[in-house]
Amino acid sequence: MTEWSAPSVYLCIATFRRPDGLRKLLTHVERLTYRGTVEVIVVDNDGDDRAGAAIVEQIAPTFRLPLRCDVEPRSGHTYAYNHAFQHACRATPAPEYVAVLDDDEYPDPNWLTEMIRVAQVYNADIVGGPVFPVFDDPDHWLAKSGFYAPSRSATGPVSTIYGAGNMVIWRSVLAQYLDEPFHHAFAFTGGSDYDFFWRCRNDGRSFAWADDARVFETMPPSRTTVGYVLRRKFRNGTEATRLERKFLCSLAGAARRWCIGLGLLGLGIASLPLAVLRGRRAIVASLMRAARGAGRIAAEFDLHYEQYR
């Protein structure tokens, strides 16, 4: 980053009963090539076992970067991340940026350098990047299916980003939402990041995408099942409807939501007979479409899948 400054960054990590994942993540964080000041806070969301806190206690004395751990006993990832955000925004000296990674991820060494470069070049308030799946069994047919392909965009300004698992935000922007940046209504269902981005967009915040700022997500066998894929699609459907009901609350918006939900469900079911002839990938693709539609319809009746409880 010879042409740009290297502003200070506070890296926020929430963890819940993934000590091995947290250890791997912190190992890769220590390998970051970013030349600016980086401080790391881990918030353990398990008030009982505190396995994440134990990992930080082991690692911190020899860790290359300033590293601390707090425990957030209130259940739900929104509480953990909001705890981390509040600490980052009130830190002294104040960091210029706040970054976010999840405890089942690990970054490329150049990740933070690229995120900050894009933030500065495009003067963006919030920057996102791709998250690539890494499978325990890369030869599993689901791993090869394309169903797990990451969201991508060209590097540069975008209307929004796709999730907080790979994110950098101006601290001064985050501080304006500090009462509850991630709303606790989404604590167990997911979607709090999309809700936050929608609010930011409505407030005129700018977004950019850093397609070379790569993060990798570990995918154990429990995530390479048809059931997992369908539950995830159902949850995606409920998230979409919840947010549209909140931010696009009109008769036209309601009609659009129902058309999309019923259309996806109907198309998914109608395509099954042909999919049976084409093989298991086609069958699962049809079921995924139907699951997303079912999730959209379920959310109209305030029914949600609590993936994180």
Residue ranges and their predicted role:
Residues 187-198:
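Acidic donor-binding loop at a coil-to-helix junction in glycosyltransferase catalytic cores
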Residues 1-31:
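N-proximal low-complexity "stem/linker" segments adjacent to membrane-targeting elements
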Residues 130, 143-160:
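Short, flexible, basic/aromatic active-site loop/helix in glycosyltransferases
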Residues 231-235, 249-309:
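Non-catalytic, C-terminal membrane-associated alpha-helical segments of glycosyltransferases
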Residues 72-90:
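Glycine-rich, basic loop-to-helix element that forms the pyrophosphate-binding segment
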Residues 110-141:
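Conserved donor NDP-sugar-binding/catalytic core segment of glycosyltransferases
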Residues 93-106:
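Short beta-strand-to-loop acidic/aromatic patch adjacent to the donor-nucleotide binding site
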Residues 30-70:
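Acidic donor-binding segment of Leloir-type glycosyltransferases
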